[in-house]
Amino acid sequence: MRVVTTPLPDVLVFLPTPHRDDRGFFTRTFDTEIFDAAVAEHTGLDVRSADFRQDSQSRSAAGVLRGLHGRGGRGETKLVRCARGAVQDVVVDARPDSPARGRSHAVVLDDVDFAHLLVPPGFLHGFLTLSDTADVCYRIDRPHDPTEDVGVR
């Protein structure tokens, strides 16, 4: 699994290495040691793999735009991947004191490369469905609390 830094601080992309043959493929979608080492080396985040508390999944039809969403309070850390289909995924730095505030980064998440996007606390997140349908999976470090939801409409 490769780890790629992005132009935004604390935002990482994890790229698994699928093993393909005539039967299909096999890939590791999460590795605690790689995740923890990458976060420690490339970010200032105080999150470890053991901190994740909830996995969620959404299914979206072609052309659906979800977001931009975030979480108030102390925020949340999300690890996002597309298990089926493809999405154009976007994060926006909304941290009040960040020198990168207002800057965005986009990446295609799909069921070919299986990239994962690390979305830090204080960032807004959204995606546009590029395929007929897309299943997006979220690994989150705090259970959802609707009273902390923030977003741009």
Regions found by a protein language model. Name each.
Residues 85, 123-124:
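Short, charged beta-turn/beta-strand-edge "cap" motif at the junction between a beta-strand
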Residues 90, 117, 125-130:
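Short beta-strand His + acidic residue motifs that chelate non-heme Fe in jelly-roll/DSBH
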Residues 113-115, 123, 134:
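Surface-exposed loop/turn positions
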